[in-house]
């Protein structure tokens, strides 16, 4: 079954070097699901913590559902992630390393359920960001040259 990307965290890909990725389920209310289907989510400042054997998504913004009434949800509440115990232990070990953090890279629909794509990341320094930009420009120039050559 195809996965439909709902929300992506482009800021994370710019500011962090992704070492490893994994998928996790997330506990949401009905109005949060409906809002996400309307692309009402933002993962810009979001991060994940592991405490007491549970994974939590913090600072993820899911806009209030526009047709939700008094039962609407809080926009930046703490949301529980659904992970197996061995996955949580593995993540705790990764986060314990210096400079490592867990960042949500995106949210997608899989068989009607919202899943979160998590990345075990290390922060990029300014010179790493510049190097990435230079490499991307070189790749673009090579692709353009190849395209001109074949036409």
Curated annotation (Swiss-Prot):
GO molecular function, one term: RNA binding
Annotated GO CC locations: cytosol
Domain of life from the UniProt record: Bacteria
Localization: Cytoplasm
Keyword Cytoplasm: yes
Location (main, coarse): cytoplasm
UniProt keyword terms in alphabetical order: Cytoplasm, RNA-binding
Gene Ontology biological process terms in this record: trans-translation
Family classification: Belongs to the SmpB family.
The protein's role, per its UniProt record: Required for rescue of stalled ribosomes mediated by trans-translation. Binds to transfer-messenger RNA (tmRNA), required for stable association of tmRNA with ribosomes. tmRNA and SmpB together mimic tRNA shape, replacing the anticodon stem-loop with SmpB. tmRNA is encoded by the ssrA gene; the 2 termini fold to resemble tRNA(Ala) and it encodes a 'tag peptide', a short internal open reading frame. During trans-translation Ala-aminoacylated tmRNA acts like a tRNA, entering the A-site of stalled ribosomes, displacing the stalled mRNA.
PANTHER family associated with the record: SSRA-BINDING PROTEIN (PTHR30308:SF2), TMRNA-BINDING COMPONENT OF TRANS-TRANSLATION TAGGING COMPLEX (PTHR30308)
Protein name: SsrA-binding protein
Gene encoding the protein: smpB
């Amino acid at each position: 079954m195809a996965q439909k990307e709902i929300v992506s965290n482009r800021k994370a890909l710019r500011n962090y070097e992704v070492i490893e990725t994994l998928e996790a389920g997330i506990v949401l209310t009905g109005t949060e699901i409906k809002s996400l289907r309307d692309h009402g989510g933002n993962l810009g400042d979001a991060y994940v913590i592991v405490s007491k054997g549970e994974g939590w998504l913090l600072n993820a913004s899911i806009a209030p559902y526009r047709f939700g009434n008094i039962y609407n949800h809080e926009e930046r509440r703490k949301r529980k992630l659904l992970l197996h115990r061995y996955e949580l232990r593995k993540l705790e070990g990764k986060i314990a390393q210096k400079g490592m953090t867990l960042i949500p890279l995106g949210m997608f629909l899989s068989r009607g359920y919202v899943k979160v794509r998590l990345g075990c990341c290390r922060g990029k320094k300014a010179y790493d960001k510049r190097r990435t930009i230079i490499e991307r420009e070189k790749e673009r120039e090579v692709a353009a040259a190849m395209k001109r050559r074949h036409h």
